[in-house]
């Protein structure tokens, strides 16, 4: 109902889908509540900030419509890592391939993956409802619908959202893949910077970066893996190495819990920032 239920509310977290967010935005904000929205409804609106606190927290203060948008999960964890490199040298280009867990499509999708594994191992026919194909023992190189340029909406979100968050002309080319992991998204990232960045520089920047944990010891087989990082708050970084084809290129691997940092935690961090800065 469109009533005065939000009168006296300082912060409202919304995570009920783009349609619901659009319908109720004015009702939620009309008495001064700050709406922190987890849907895609407002992310690319020019008068609504798109915020990852480790990267562009101050943008949250400029919200003429009383709304702050939470970015897409894959974008959030990527820009937290990119910020550390951007502080060393401007990033010109990013190529990223994502390995996105089943739970990124919702709890029912995660349940379907469980069911599919049981069915395959029992020799039964496989239930396919939440994905275009069987995900168990498979990879699906499509997340969301395809656009006219051959990229999916998920991939284009990474292009547009990254530029808005980082206030940059950075070019992003993404390939987003659904993988049969239960939770936490992984990303293989290649960046081209204006000047060469050494592995040592990058490692130090990641180690000091806000919201990042360095896990990069290949000799001991230590690197981020989704199996062990579900439920963790930070973005983990490893497999840091120089590109062999471009002296200004650097490659690394990140893993983050898309339900925590990729959604809920990021929204809470925005609220904490507003409270801390007395910016409500």
PLM segments and residue spans:
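N-terminal Rossmann-like NAD(P) cofactor-binding subdomain of oxidoreductases
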Residues: 1-135, 171, 235-236, 240-245, ...
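Glycine-rich phosphate/pyrophosphate-binding beta-alpha loops
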Residues: 177-180, 256-261
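A generic structural signal for short
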Residues: 12-13, 69-70, 146-150, 191, ...
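A glycine-rich, Thr/Ser-enriched phosphate-binding loop motif common to dinucleotide/cofactor-binding enzymes
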Residues: 66-77, 150-159, 164, 262-266
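C-terminal substrate-binding/catalytic lobe of Rossmann-fold NAD(P)-dependent oxidoreductases
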Residues: 1-6, 93-98, 102-251
């Amino acid at each position: 109902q469109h009533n005065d239920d939000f009168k006296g509310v300082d912060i409202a977290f919304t995570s009920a889908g783009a349609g619901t967010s659009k319908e109720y935005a004015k009702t939620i904000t009309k008495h001064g509540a700050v709406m922190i929205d987890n849907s895609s409804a407002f992310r690319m609106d020019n008068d609504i900030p798109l915020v990852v606190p480790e990267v562009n927290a101050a943008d949250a203060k400029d919200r003429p419509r009383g709304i702050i948008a939470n970015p897409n999960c894959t974008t959030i964890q990527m820009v937290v890592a990119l910020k550390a490199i951007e502080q060393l040298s401007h990033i010109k280009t990013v190529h990223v391939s994502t390995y996105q867990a089943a739970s990124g499509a919702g709890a029912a999708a995660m349940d379907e993956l469980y069911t599919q594994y049981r069915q395959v191992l029992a020799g039964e026919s496989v239930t396919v409802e939440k994905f275009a194909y069987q995900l168990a023992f498979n990879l699906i190189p499509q997340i969301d619908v395809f656009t006219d340029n051959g990229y999916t909406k998920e991939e284009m979100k990474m292009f547009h959202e990254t530029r808005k968050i980082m206030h940059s002309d950075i070019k992003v080319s993404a390939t987003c893949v659904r993988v049969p992991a239960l939770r936490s998204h992984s990303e293989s990232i290649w960046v081209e910077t204006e000047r060469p960045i050494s592995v040592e520089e990058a490692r130090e920047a990641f180690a000091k970066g806000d919201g990042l944990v360095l896990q990069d010891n290949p000799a001991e087989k230590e690197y981020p893996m989704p199996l062990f990082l579900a439920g963790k708050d930070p973005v983990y970084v490893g497999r840091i190495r120089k590109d062999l084809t471009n002296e200004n290129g650097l490659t690394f691997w990140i893993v983050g819990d898309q339900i925590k940092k990729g959604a809920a935690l990021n929204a809470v961090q925005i609220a904490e920032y507003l409270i801390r800065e007395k910016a409500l």
